[in-house]
């Protein structure tokens, strides 16, 4: 194996995101697909991961046991569901494997487990691995510092019908970026639903609206609205490959890290801007 290469394992190999990750891993220079995982009992077990993803034969067989492939990867990439990700996290912590986590919907206990594991292993944990989204988060911080104290702030997000959590992790990250720039805690100022007689809008709050429809990959808009004008900052994703490439880029970046909790802005160096 070339010194620059890093071997990755992909969780949820048969899912929409898993297949994109396999394609990206097989195409990206410096990355080697080392393992592909599916749940116990899946009809996809025993398949060639590359053929499953439509990327050609890879020689990597889809398996259900992390123990069986523990020597085949350096970084584990997980875009599944919180309960599965936390199981994988415990394994990676035990065996000293890095992780790239794109799973959303964690409760506070799950997030704390990730923080604790990062004391021993290196983790990139991000709500969205798109370069464009992370540039947007930086722009939101700057817009909030200028407009946030006198404008009404609303975040609108849209995803496909199969997404199971709301608001999206990216929408929450947008809210946290804005709230942080205003020296607020999002938990204290977020409004997640409006129905019936709500009264007038409460100043200083951040509203969220959610759409679930069709096959929308992901659309996010933050609105800063004042009397007579408004500024909207929008990101639209047309392919999951942008998230997959960002995740693989993060795995390569982790190569030199022993431990710590990072996000995509660290990978891209956006905090120095």
From Swiss-Prot:
Assembly description: Homotetramer.
Binding-site list for (S)-2,3,4,5-tetrahydrodipicolinate: 160, 169-170
Localization terms from the record: Cytoplasm
UniProt-recorded name of the protein: 4-hydroxy-tetrahydrodipicolinate reductase
PROSITE patterns: DAPB
EC numbers for this chain: 1.17.1.8
InterPro entries per record: DapB_C (IPR022663), DapB_N (IPR000846), DapB_N_CS (IPR022664), DHDPR_bac (IPR023940), NAD(P)-bd_dom_sf (IPR036291)
Native source organism of the sequence: Salmonella typhimurium (strain LT2 / SGSC1412 / ATCC 700720)
Keyword Oxidoreductase part of the UniProt annotation: yes
Reaction(s) this enzyme catalyzes, per UniProt: (S)-2,3,4,5-tetrahydrodipicolinate + NAD(+) + H2O = (2S,4S)-4-hydroxy-2,3,4,5-tetrahydrodipicolinate + NADH + H(+); (S)-2,3,4,5-tetrahydrodipicolinate + NADP(+) + H2O = (2S,4S)-4-hydroxy-2,3,4,5-tetrahydrodipicolinate + NADPH + H(+)
Family of the protein in this entry: Belongs to the DapB family.
GO CC, one annotated term: cytosol
UniProt keyword list: Amino-acid biosynthesis, Cytoplasm, Diaminopimelate biosynthesis, Lysine biosynthesis, NAD, NADP, Oxidoreductase
Binding site for NAD(+): 12-17, 38, 102-104, 126-129
GO BP term, pick one: diaminopimelate biosynthetic process
Keyword Cytoplasm among record annotations: yes
